[in-house]
Amino acid sequence: MKKKNIYSIRKLGVGIASVTLGTLLISGGVTPAANAAQHDEAQQNAFYQVLNMPNLNADQRNGFIQSLKDDPSQSANVLGEAQKLNDSQAPKADAQQNNFNKDQQSAFYEILNMPNLNEAQRNGFIQSLKDDPSQSTNVLGEAKKLNESQAPKADNNFNKEQQNAFYEILNMPNLNEEQRNGFIQSLKDDPSQSANLLSEAKKLNESQAPKADNKFNKEQQNAFYEILHLPNLNEEQRNGFIQSLKDDPSVSKEILAEAKKLNDAQAPKEEDNKKPGKEDGNKPGKEDGNKPGKEDNKKPGKEDGNKPGKEDNNKPGKEDGNKPGKEDNNKPGKEDGNKPGKEDGNKPGKEDGNGVHVVKPGDTVNDIAKANGTTADKIAADNKLADKNMIKPGQELVVDKKQPANHADANKAQALPETGEENPFIGTTVFGGLSLALGAALLAGRRREL
């Protein structure tokens, strides 16, 4: 029995050993294939992660996978090394910013400096730029719209008066940038002073306006015209007064007064002009008008008027002697002696007898025309004056004189000397002489009878 049991035990041991050996043999023959097909969970995870690491190149990825295959027990270590290398090769955020295209960079900078975006809005737009740089222009446009819509409205704080002042000051052309900004800041600081600030701005704008030569006021224009026609100013003086008018039109009256004073001071003296007039006008007038009158009127009157001819002498004498005497001695004397004397003495050469007038200081064309019985336009036309007010002392003007009616009658009388109508006094004298002769004949006849 004992032997039988021992045999059985031995037989069982051999069987177990055989089975074990077979198992070992079988296991040793299929190990590489089983390892490749049946990775444990750690190996599988490591394999999957290494395949999806974006920053590994192909050689690096294949090397890590081969290491996992070679020694699955080192899967955790291999995976750790792969992750480190992947992280070290990952692109930095700053580097990405530096690689933005030009539009993206510009948009990024502008959005960062938009004052009316809050932090969340700004970060949202920047993230959109990072996600899709090709949309930089659109993202920037949206950011600008939002920034403008959230800007504080300046007009909401201005009242109507302030708004008007603000607008007017902005459009004042003669203020410089600093002045304009100063007034606008004052408007913002105190809107209640809008009217006063606007008034000050207007004054400053007007004071700095360029002076326009063609915008003379009426007073300035008058002074300008008169100074141009002052005959005794030289060119330099005239230009000086005109420049003063341009510089300050408000003192036009004072400038004109100074110009007139200087013009009068430089006028030619009248002493030289009066002497010929006195000699020509007064002395000849007295000699021609008084002496001949006395001789012609009084002597024949005395001879004729006592005995025979009271009737003939007095009546005709009064009519013929006095009236003609007055006409001949006084009127012609005044005309020939006094008027020409005044004209020759006071206004030198107003008329020299040949229809020529010599201009004296103070003369105007209108005055000359009135004195000579013509018109200013006629004088201007005859002398080809461009401006009838532009005449100078000493200038000779042709005057087409129209004589008064009494002169015309005198001329007619002078044109008929044969009839005795030239001078009524001559007719009276002849008549008186005949009367005397007749009286003398009668007187002689009576004496003979006696």
From Swiss-Prot:
Residues 268-355 are annotated as: 12 X 8 AA approximate tandem repeats. Important immunodiagnostic reagent because of its ability to bind the Fab and Fc fragments of a wide range of mammalian immunoglobulins. Residues 1-36 form the signal peptide. Immunoglobulin-binding region A repeats lie at residues 154-211. Sequence repeats lie at residues 268-275, 276-283, 284-291, 292-299, 300-307, 308-315, 316-323, 324-331, 332-339, 340-347, 348-355. It comes from the Bacteria. Residues 260-365, 401-421 are annotated as: Disordered. A motif (LPXTG sorting signal) lies at residues 416-420. Residues 355-399 form the LysM domain. It is a peptidoglycan-anchor. Immunoglobulin-binding region E repeats lie at residues 37-92. It is found in: Secreted, Cell wall. Belongs to the immunoglobulin-binding protein SpA family. Each of the immunoglobulin-binding region repeats can bind the Fc region of an immunoglobulin. NCBIfam families: LPXTG_anchor (TIGR01167), YSIRK_signal (TIGR01168). This is Immunoglobulin G-binding protein A. The gene is spa.
